[in-house]
């Protein structure tokens, strides 16, 4: 059984985070990201921006969510993300960055001071 979906949904509920009609930025394309996207879609998100250092991995995750050439997922190139991040309500770190003590996510979070960062 996939516990990632249950765990992510519970973390949203426990922290009283409503994602309905929100714009979400997901950093990374690791295994957990697919579960997160599934839950976000079932909860009615407006748009998901997905960025990964390897763009093709993000595109592969986006593909199942394309319908009539439209998708709630927009892939953002990592370099563009660092220069001009999209305006979002919530940021989710799906990368391995942050697991080690000295890890730094190279994103300017000042733009997101009042946003939810997970």
Language-model regions: role of each:
Residues 1-22:
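Glycine/small-residue-rich loop that forms an oxyanion/phosphate-binding "nest" at active or ligand-binding sites
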Residues 10, 14, 38-42, 63-67:
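Short, well-ordered alpha-helices that flank and scaffold nucleotide-derived cofactor binding pockets
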Residues 12, 21-41:
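Glycine-rich adenosine-cofactor-binding loop
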Residues 20-22, 45, 114-115:
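Phosphate-coordination loops involved in phosphoryl transfer and adenosine-cofactor binding
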Residues 43-68:
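NAD(P)-binding Rossmann-fold cofactor-contacting core
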Residues 71-118:
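Rossmann-like adenosine-cofactor binding region
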């Amino acid at each position: 059984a996939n516990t990632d979906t249950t765990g992510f949904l519970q973390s949203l509920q426990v922290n009283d985070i409503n994602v309905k009609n929100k714009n979400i930025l997901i950093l990374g394309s690791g295994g957990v990201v697919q579960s997160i996207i599934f839950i976000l879609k079932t909860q009615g998100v407006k748009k998901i921006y997905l960025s990964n250092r390897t763009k093709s991995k993000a595109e592969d995750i986006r593909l199942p969510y394309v319908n009539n050439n439209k998708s709630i997922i927009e892939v953002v190139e990592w370099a563009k993300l660092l220069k001009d991040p999209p305006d979002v309500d919530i940021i989710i770190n799906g990368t391995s960055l942050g697991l080690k003590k000295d890890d730094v996510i190279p994103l300017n979070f000042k733009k997101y001071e009042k946003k939810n960062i997970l």
